[in-house]
């Protein structure tokens, strides 16, 4: 590793956006440089700011986001950056089913494989359930229904994807069994991210409290037009083809339903 690469590595360690400049992702045109949307930059900044000592009370995040806006890519980049530059850390990716969690882990492994060699750490375990680096940091994929795998364990970064789609009883059990361990640590971070899916669910309750500053979660709402091609014409087409309620929930990120 030369001096230039060492300096780049130092900058990447301090700034997740700097790290993201070296990320390549698979697109319809093949492997391409990651070009973040404005909201993706803001989310990466928010997540990483929560790691600072002065932000100890605002480390946890809850995000509502529209379909197919690139939120999974952000989860993958942030989790990978966290693992590479923080030794001896444990990361868990949780979703409503194991296959969904594995898909995110696959994306993380994909990004990892395409990093420049001077940034990419050696992996001691690399399969569809766990990725572990030589710095002793690792990430596992779990389903919400099997959170016994992480119950009582000290997870440094827990990311729950499509949290609103987890079965209500599974999500409630997750909160009761995992959240107390996380909440007792000032250095642990939890990120809940999802498209809304009704109001009779713990995810909605956490969101409602977050926007009223009644819990430790920092709320972020991603708008339907956060993706450049999503304009009024696109909106009208989606409503025409799928209906107003579909658009409001899946893209305008409204919580629709009744108790």
Identify what each model region corresponds to.
Residues 1-259:
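Short, flexible loop motifs at catalytic/binding sites
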């Amino acid at each position: 590793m030369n001096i230039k690469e060492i300096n780049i590595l130092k900058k990447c360690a301090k700034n997740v956006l700097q790290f993201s400049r070296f990320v390549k992702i698979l697109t319809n045109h093949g492997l391409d440089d990651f070009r973040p949307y404005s909201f993706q930059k803001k989310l990466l900044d928010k997540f990483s700011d929560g790691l600072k000592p002065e932000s100890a009370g605002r480390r946890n995040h809850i995000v509502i986001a529209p379909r197919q806006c690139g939120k999974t890519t952000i989860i993958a980049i942030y989790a990978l950056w966290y693992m590479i530059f923080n030794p001896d850390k444990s990361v868990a990716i949780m979703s409503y089913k194991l296959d969904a969690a594995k898909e995110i882990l696959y994306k993380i492994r994909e990004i990892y494989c395409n990093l420049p060699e001077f940034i990419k750490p050696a992996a001691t375990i690399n399969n569809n359930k766990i990725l572990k680096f030589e710095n002793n940091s690792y990430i596992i994929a779990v389903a919400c229904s099997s959170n016994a795998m992480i119950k009582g364990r000290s997870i440094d970064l827990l990311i729950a994807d499509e949290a609103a789609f987890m079965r209500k009883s599974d999500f409630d059990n997750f909160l009761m069994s995992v959240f107390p361990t996380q909440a007792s640590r000032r250095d642990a971070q939890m990120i809940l991210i999802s498209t809304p899916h009704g109001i009779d669910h713990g995810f909605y309750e956490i969101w409602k409290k977050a926007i009223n500053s009644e819990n430790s979660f920092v709320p972020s709402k991603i708008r339907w037009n956060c993706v450049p091609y999503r304009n009024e014409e696109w909106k009208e087409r989606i409503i025409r083809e799928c209906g107003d309620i579909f658009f409001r929930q899946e893209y305008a990120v409204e919580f629709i339903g009744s108790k």
